[in-house]
């Protein structure tokens, strides 16, 4: 299927210049090692500001599962949760911190040859590309998850690369909706994940110490989207419609931060997306370590409204599209 975004560059840094832009397809590595010395950032600065993570979301009519492995340079962290959409409550919510390198890793390969792991006492998480799928394993906090996100015949992935105020640059690979096989056992229940819809977020950047964003992501067989308003501007705003990857304009989030389980509205200034989000529940966490702090809330729910492939195209009605929003602030 044709689209308006170019193919990815061979590398993030070419001839001393960062390849800023939006691209359709996969890049081998998210690697900043070729940044020239003229950027004036030493090794200690880069170590403190280099942030890498992989996030996976899995959605069915019964449950939503979210998990991530994060390398913030001076610390590793991970979380996993299972939300029961029928009872509207968390069946499990686990998180842990670990020492860099000793507790795991987030490698620079975002999709192909992806290999991210986290280990702590009695817990393990892994996201690996094996054969034609992303294999996801979680044994932590009462969650026993085995899932495969199928990569074959997938619509184009997004690669977004852009400058960061107070940092240097950021890059992310966002997946379209990916078919899932597998199962999860939690709280004495077993849920079949065959037929679920999954997504991957692989991000890697040299970010500012204070970073904030609003994010929304949802996927179905024919329509999906990724939106962000915050530190990365509109670089990662895209719509997948009938297997075509369509760049979107700036995203706007209308919600009550004090009551995140009230309805949200998300829309883009190009008129291609206008959706209402109805939360069913949320995972949230607030942490303050003095030198580092974070506020995080990720509601789970459904989107309804309309999207368009172009300003002159007829609107496509969206109903019951399962996904998440997020309000996140970090000092890291």
Where do the protein language model's features map onto the residues?
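Structured soluble/peripheral alpha/beta segments that form catalytic or ligand/cofactor-binding pockets
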Residues: 1-332
């Amino acid at each position: 299927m044709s689209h308006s975004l170019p193919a990815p560059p061979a590398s993030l840094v070419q001839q001393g210049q960062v390849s800023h832009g939006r691209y359709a397809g996969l890049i081998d590595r998210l690697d900043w090692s070729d940044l020239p010395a003229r950027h004036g950032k030493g090794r200690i600065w880069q170590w403190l500001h280099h942030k890498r993570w992989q996030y996976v979301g899995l959605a069915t009519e019964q449950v939503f599962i979210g998990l991530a492995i994060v390398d913030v340079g001076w610390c590793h962290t991970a979380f996993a949760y299972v939300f029961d959409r029928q009872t509207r409550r968390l069946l499990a919510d686990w998180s842990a911190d670990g020492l860099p390198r000793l507790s795991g890793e987030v490698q620079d390969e975002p999709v192909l040859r992806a290999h991210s792991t986290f280990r702590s006492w009695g817990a393990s998480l892994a996201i690996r590309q094996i054969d034609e799928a992303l294999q996801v394993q979680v044994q932590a906090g009462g969650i026993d998850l085995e899932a495969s996100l199928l990569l074959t015949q997938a619509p184009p992935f997004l690669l977004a690369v852009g400058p960061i105020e107070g940092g240097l640059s950021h890059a992310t690979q966002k997946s379209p909706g990916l078919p899932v096989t597998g199962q999860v056992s939690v709280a004495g229940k077993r849920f079949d994940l065959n037929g679920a819809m999954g997504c991957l977020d692989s991000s890697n950047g040299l970010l500012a110490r204070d970073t904030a964003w609003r994010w929304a992501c949802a996927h179905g067989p024919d329509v999906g989207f990724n939106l962000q308003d915050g530190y990365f501007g509109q670089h990662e705003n895209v719509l997948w419609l009938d297997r075509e990857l369509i760049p979107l304009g700036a995203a706007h989030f209308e919600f009550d931060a004090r009551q995140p389980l009230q309805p949200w509205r998300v829309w883009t200034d190009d008129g291609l997306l206008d959706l209402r989000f109805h939360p069913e529940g949320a995972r949230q966490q607030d942490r303050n370590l003095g030198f580092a702090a974070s506020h995080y809330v990720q509601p789970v729910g459904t989107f309804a409204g309309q999207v368009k492939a172009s300003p002159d195209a007829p609107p496509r009605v969206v109903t019951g599209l399962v996904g998440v929003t997020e309000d996140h602030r970090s000092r890291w």
